[in-house]
């Protein structure tokens, strides 16, 4: 194959330039304006549950502002999912707080509710106080066991900040991911379900929380004619130009989600019954992943190879793949942080690959990818 097949490239609707041109024509090129307002309204309608949405410069910024509004500060602990990208945990450190890492369960690869409750009890026993927040992730678009996580959080009266950066459009029991916690986080990075070039959003419970989020995202400027600041703020608002890209992307969001699910269904059919290669799929009917990235596990005993060897061979054949996230409790920067592990995320990390699933991936591409993966696993 002459072309290179990428994991998930941005796919434009063709309407983005019109919204951007409108911003230039009206000179709305700042971090506010009609595109920002409209993009937030469209996201609010999409996620539902009577939530409000604030468009921001990144998903990381959204996590940071969520933590601030939950009162997370120096000396606090926040329970975080270990099997994730570092941006899920780093904002905890921004606040001078300590991430406490929880391993995954097999069904969804997300935060294990059993370990979560064990960790809460243990942290209370060791520190004399509850963790300040719980930060689960919907990894690769697969919904976590969020009902169990939220039930445990409610039992101990700990708020949930839900990282749905990879899960725009994913659902658990028909409800959109990102709407279960006190706050929810979305990402519009260039490789996500939709993009604003860079960007993210914080899903908040009400208008009051939206105003508070916007306050902190706009350098915490007080309502005076002069510039007055009584709290530390941040430059986290999304520009009107980037929001214009987002508005164009919203017109094809449903198509993008449908395409990712279609590609996954093709993989599911192609890998069925293949010994040594396991495709990650919805555990049962409660889960409806967007399949932002499709993921496979390669059993080294049954295939005679390993994920990294397969990755290198696929790269030579024009197919981009990527190892699964290295768990946070294995990262040098968090080597001394408390962690509650069961071995699941380490095993997954040592066996797994992300494979192409984006809007540019065709049925023919999937057939070629599957053919090459099978060939790599036959030596």
Annotate each language-model stretch with its function.
Residues 84-89:
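Conserved coil-to-alpha-helix start sites within the AMP-binding
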Residues 107-196, 201-203, 208:
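Active-site phosphate-binding strand-loop segment of PLP-dependent enzymes
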Residues 1-30, 356:
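N-terminal "arm"/small-domain region of PLP-dependent enzymes with the aminotransferase-like
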Residues 96:
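Structured binding elements
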Residues 34-41, 50-51, 114-118, 126-129, ...:
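PLP-dependent aminotransferase class I/II
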Residues 32-77, 91-93, 101-103, 126, ...:
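Phosphate-binding glycine-rich loop
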Residues 93, 150, 154, 315:
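Anion (oxyanion) recognition and catalysis
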